């Protein structure tokens, strides 16, 4: 219940703008300005109680408290490490980022790319921080986390060994913005060791809020040049690199003056007419040095004399140091990898860019209810969350004669790095996209069933199921309606996720789920309608007061169930019996009369029939995945969120729902629906309750 309330509160705050870059969420409710002012007034330096300078902040295994790698480590402030520490000197450069004893080169490569764009860097690293003016030992940074911007506060105590920084550091040793940024990122992920191993695209996304895709240039898609052109038009960040095969290869220079292991940026893509044929050219920037390409289409290459002079002047006019052109074919031959970080519309302040249309949807997989696994598990796959994608407008320009709607889908699993210290790691995740059949077009209130997925193949799917934070793919499909199904590879894996869809044109996206519905059987009978046989049975069971209490009901039902071989049960708990009596006790006596007991008896017989029919494996019990079908048979339709709550409340640790809990669930639901209907006679879908009424209904 607390989790549901927290989600509702968070959704309301997000609707009011909390989590945007201008209104970043304060991580762990720590307010940078308030904490700094407190320290300045008290004349003390900040010590972060939420990420203290202790061994557990370093790691849990390789960097754990008893690891040899962490012996002799001292936490020191920059003022204790060098005589004149600086936060940032003359802007951020690559030399500010040198790797230490942590396997987070993926993160450092993303930080290096961040330094190429001052506007985006300033969003992540507020530059008005220093070790001189208003210094209080506290610094702050902003990261994108699963759809919202978060402000993270850290103190400036950094791990050192033999007087040197243990992790990231600047080349000259007196600049500390990168070390403090790494510490803030370690804090939000649980510890430094949680940063070991990852993809540069992950860092790209957390620094920009964009959606990052990458391409192996040895196997490029046929339309890659067009993808690059469109990405540049949209203001995306593009980086490329040449793989290294050994540590000795790092910074090695090829015979045509390209540097291996270097982060280059792609800044242009043009087609020019040369000697009667079209040539595709790529402009590359080497931000770190004077080394420039000496192959075809370099600055002094005769090939420039083969194109129109005005075109040559436009393309060769220098804008940035270290920029050079090369043919697209040489680009594919010499470089290994291209990364594109597609930025969100709010990141781009200029109106010159063609901006993506962005939609984000949050969801979760819950063991026993909505964690159905992949298509290899047909009995449960359909239980996964489902999302409708409605593509309406085709792209403005066709690629290679192919029309359609271009969109990117990124599925991110949340908070998995933070859970590494608890022994958890990344799930293996992926997704499928299914075409909606004509008969279901326009409907968003139907969760597609098991039979649909048994008879329909995926129109598209993620390239692979993989244990990375994000699975991302680019698609092009005709206008129409499609269902996106995200899943873990195996069923029963708990996890939270967010899905982001970047589309060329405006498209409609929303969760597909069953609407809440209760078709309850009404009993319009009088005592005169009850046959004599049942009257005699009731008189025998009820005793002298001619009424049945919850305790008497428990005894009666235990005897009945003991005779059933097809339902495993130890009888009903007194709690279930009290709920049944409350549901039908119309006169408030706390007991059931003849008519009330007759209605209950009829309901229990119906419940037994449903339970038996749903139990297809004849185990005498029901598993949590069968519960959804059972609820439908009983007249209830529920969205995924309610199924998660029901399984969490009524299933045991083996995901079994026994007959007692099955009946308790149905009776509880029926009672709640009847209360709501009584308080909402106009069927508005909302009711108002004061605190005492809310509490009375909640403790039913």
From Swiss-Prot:
Required co-factors: Ca(2+)
Binding of Ca(2+) 4, residues: 292, 299, 323
Record Gene3D superfamilies: 2.60.120.380, Cysteine proteinases (3.90.70.10), EF-hand (1.10.238.10)
Binding site for Ca(2+) 3: 89, 91, 96, 175
UniProt: Ca(2+) 1 binding residues: 658, 661
Active site annotation, chain numbering: 105, 262, 286
UniProt-annotated binding residues for Ca(2+) 6: 585, 587, 589, 591, 596
Entry keywords, A to Z: Acetylation, Calcium, Cell membrane, Cytoplasm, Hydrolase, Membrane, Metal-binding, Protease, Repeat, Thiol protease
Chief location of this protein within or outside the cell: cytoplasm
Record region (Domain IV): 530-700
Tissue expression: Ubiquitous.
GO biological process terms, semicolon-separated: behavioral response to pain; blastocyst development; cellular response to amino acid stimulus; cellular response to interferon-beta; cellular response to lipopolysaccharide; female pregnancy; myoblast fusion; positive regulation of cardiac muscle cell apoptotic process
Subcellular location: Cytoplasm; Cell membrane
Activity regulation details: Activated by 200-1000 micromolar concentrations of calcium and inhibited by calpastatin.
Cross-referenced SUPFAM superfamilies: Calpain large subunit, middle domain (domain III) (SSF49758), Cysteine proteinases (SSF54001), EF-hand (SSF47473)
Modified residues (N-acetylalanine): 2
Alphabetical list of InterPro entries matching this protein: C2_III, Calpain_cysteine_protease, Calpain_domain_III, Calpain_III, Calpain_III_sf, EF-hand-dom_pair, EF_Hand_1_Ca_BS, EF_hand_dom
Family listed: Belongs to the peptidase C2 family.
Record function comment: Calcium-regulated non-lysosomal thiol-protease which catalyzes limited proteolysis of substrates involved in cytoskeletal remodeling and signal transduction. Proteolytically cleaves MYOC at 'Arg-226'. Proteolytically cleaves CPEB3 following neuronal stimulation which abolishes CPEB3 translational repressor activity, leading to translation of CPEB3 target mRNAs.
Annotated protein name in UniProt: Calpain-2 catalytic subunit
Protein's organism: Homo sapiens (Human)
Gene from which the chain derives: CAPN2
């Amino acid at each position: 219940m607390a989790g549901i309330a927290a989600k509702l509160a968070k959704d309301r705050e997000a609707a009011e703008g909390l989590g945007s870059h201008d209104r970043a969420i304060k991580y762990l409710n720590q307010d940078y300005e308030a904490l700094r002012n407190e320290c300045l007034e008290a004349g003390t330096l900040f010590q972060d109680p939420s990420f203290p300078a202790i061994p557990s902040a370093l790691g849990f295994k390789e960097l754990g408290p008893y690891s040899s790698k962490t012996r002799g480590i001292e936490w020191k402030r920059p003022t204790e490490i060098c005589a004149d520490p600086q936060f940032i000197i003359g802007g951020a450069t690559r030399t500010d980022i040198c790797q230490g004893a942590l396997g987070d080169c993926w993160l450092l490569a993303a930080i290096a790319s961040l330094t190429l764009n001052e506007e985006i860097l300033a969003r992540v690293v507020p530059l008005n921080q220093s070790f001189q003016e208003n210094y209080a030992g506290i610094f702050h940074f902003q990261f994108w986390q699963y759809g919202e911007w978060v402000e993270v506060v850290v103190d400036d105590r950094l791990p050192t060994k033999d007087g040197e920084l243990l992790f990231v550091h600047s080349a000259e040793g007196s600049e500390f913005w990168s070390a403090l940024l790494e510490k803030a990122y370690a804090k939000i992920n649980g510890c430094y060791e949680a940063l070991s191993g990852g993809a540069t695209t992950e860092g790209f996304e957390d620094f920009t809020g964009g959606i990052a895709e990458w391409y192996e240039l040895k196997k490029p898609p046929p339309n890659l040049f067009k993808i690059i052109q469109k990405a540049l038009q949209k203001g995306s960040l593009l980086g490329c690199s040449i793989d290294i095969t050994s540590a000795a290869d790092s910074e090695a220079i090829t015979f045509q003056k390209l540097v291996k292991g270097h982060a280059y940026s792609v800044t242009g893509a043009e087609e020019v007419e040369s000697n009667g044929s079209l040539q595709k050219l790529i402009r590359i920037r080497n931000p770190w040095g004077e080394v420039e390409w000496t192959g075809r289409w370099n600055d002094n290459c005769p090939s420039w004399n083969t194109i129109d002079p005005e075109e040559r002047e436009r393309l060769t006019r220098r804008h940035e140091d270290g920029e050079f052109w090369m043919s697209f074919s040489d680009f594919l031959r010499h470089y290994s990898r291209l990364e594109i970080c597609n930025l969100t519309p709010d990141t781009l302040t200029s109106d010159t860019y063609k901006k993506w249309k962005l939609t984000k949807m949050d969801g979760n997989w819950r063991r026993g209810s909505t964690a159905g696994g992949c298509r290899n598990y047909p009995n449960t796959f359909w239980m996964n969350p489902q999302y409708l994608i409605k593509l309406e407008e085709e792209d403005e320009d066709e690629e290679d004669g192919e029309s359609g709607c271009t969109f990117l889908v990124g599925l991110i699993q949340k908070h998995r790095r933070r859970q590494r210290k608890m022994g958890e790691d990344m799930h293996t995740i992926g997704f499928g996209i299914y075409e909606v059949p004509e008969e279901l077009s326009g409907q968003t209130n139907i969760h597609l069933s098991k039979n649909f997925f048994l008879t329909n193949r995926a129109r598209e799917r993620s390239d692979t199921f993989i244990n990375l934070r994000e699975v991302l793919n680019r698609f092009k499909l005709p206008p129409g309606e499609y269902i996106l199904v995200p899943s873990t590879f195996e069923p029963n894996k708990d996890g939270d996720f967010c899905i982001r869809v970047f589309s060329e044109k405006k498209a409609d996206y929303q969760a597909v789920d069953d609407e809440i519905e209760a078709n309850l059987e009404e009993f319009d009978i009088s005592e005169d309608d009850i046959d004599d046989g049942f009257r005699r049975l009731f008189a025998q069971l009820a005793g002298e007061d001619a009424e049945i209490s919850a305790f008497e009901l428990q005894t009666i039902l235990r005897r009945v169930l003991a005779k059933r071989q097809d339902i495993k049960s130890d009888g009903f708990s007194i709690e279930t019996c009290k709920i049944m009596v409350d549901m039908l006790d119309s006169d408030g006596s706390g007991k059931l009369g003849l008519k009330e007991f007759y209605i209950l008896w009829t309901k229990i017989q119906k419940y037994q029939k449903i339970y038996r029919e749903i139990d297809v494996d004849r185990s005498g019990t029901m598993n949590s995945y069968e519960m959804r079908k059972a609820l439908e048979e009983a007249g209830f339709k529920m969205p995924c969120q309610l199924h998660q709550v029901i399984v969490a409340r009524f299933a045991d640790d083996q995901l079994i729902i026994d007959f007692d809990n099955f009946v308790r669930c149905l009776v509880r639901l029926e009672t709640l629906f009847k209360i709501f209907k009584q308080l909402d006679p106009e069927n508005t879908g909302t009711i108002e309750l004061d605190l005492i009424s809310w509490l009375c209904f909640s403790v039913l």
